[in-house]
Amino acid sequence: MTGVHTMFHKRYEKHVENHQTRRAILSGIASTLGVSVMSPWTRVLEAAPATSATKAKKVIYFYMSGAMSHIDTFDPKPEQPSIQGDVGVVKTKTPGIMFGEHMTNLAELQDKLAIVRSMTTETADHSKARYWLQTSYPVLNSIRHPAMGAWVSNEMGKINKALPPFVLVNSGGNGHPGAGFLDPSLTPVPVADPEKGIENTELPSYLTDEVFKRRLSLADRIDAGFRERYAGYQLESYNQMYKDAVKLMGGSDLEAFDLTKEKEEVKERYGSSKVGLGALLARRLVEKDVRFVQVDYGGWDMHNDVAGSMAGKAPALDQALGALIRDLDSSGLLNETLIVLASEFGRSPAINQNAGRDHHPAAFSYVLAGAGIKGGAVYGKSDEKGHGIDEDPVGITDFNSTITVACGLDPNKEHFAPNGRPFKIGGGGDPIYDVLS
């Protein structure tokens, strides 16, 4: 383990140890003294600039699993040839702002994007960093925190009552935090392959609708005693999920998951890659008022041949995001849909002996677009070699709190887990108002 990794792991472990106790101790002291602790959010609100009334109603969240390189995408360093390596750069609409050479579509759309170039996190471990990004909290053995999609769906509710509020594309769901301690109905519906949609939704040829209804009725009668004996909100939630699934099987809204309904020229614009098809499916789902769609796209753990690996990975992402943003903008849905592009951490500016880049949590970049976002914004600054942060460092909780505010939600609202501990949607971070419209 490198010195950088050791430092961040120690900070991470200290964070886990202290994170949950500070507010409880302060609140306890305040209660004893008969006073209250002023919420930090109160001071944030006093200092926060006014934002427009346009807030996101839906979210499409692109998660780049494996840790995407900032040097080769949204924070290139062409003035440092040994750092930049063999991946070139491309100009954007803003003079002086450049992207990696494979981001040609997004360079043309830079006026619709907000780039955060000063992200930093506290661990270089994939699983821990992934969990922290998706939940706003470090891993704890005593509790499972909700993913951002579950948080947002819980607070904002369903729009389309016939469809699930939270869909997870290109992932089987293994290792995903899901609903955490929230209602089980907020668990994301997984779509492992966008071309197949939700599988096993059609009745087999030997089973008629009438026979299926009779079987459902019989199952309901058999389960009645169990439901009465073990009545509770969790059991009721699972029962409701089952009913919703049956309702979806017979409804027209299921077509939202069917990519065969799209014209071939549309599919070609998005591309045939997993992320291209995932982006197309995400567009169809938000058109049908699904609240939160997460699209996973793995393969960014480029320890070897980063230039060749980027050439095989980044163009598909650029094509998919470019097509999605243009389509949503054309239909007017970009005004109510927040698009997020994030990865668990970054990759080292220094190119290793295998022509790749290693794990690097100290500096990396994220992208926001759409509802609630100030297009053309570039926030924060990494140092001249992209190794650390020179200006305006942004932590994971700050970024997730920014998503929270973009959705019109209060990042200071507390939710209590079954063990009595308070948690917040964005983990109590400071929203980045400079990228909010």
Name each model feature, range by range.
Residues 2-437:
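Ligand-binding pockets and gating/stacking loops
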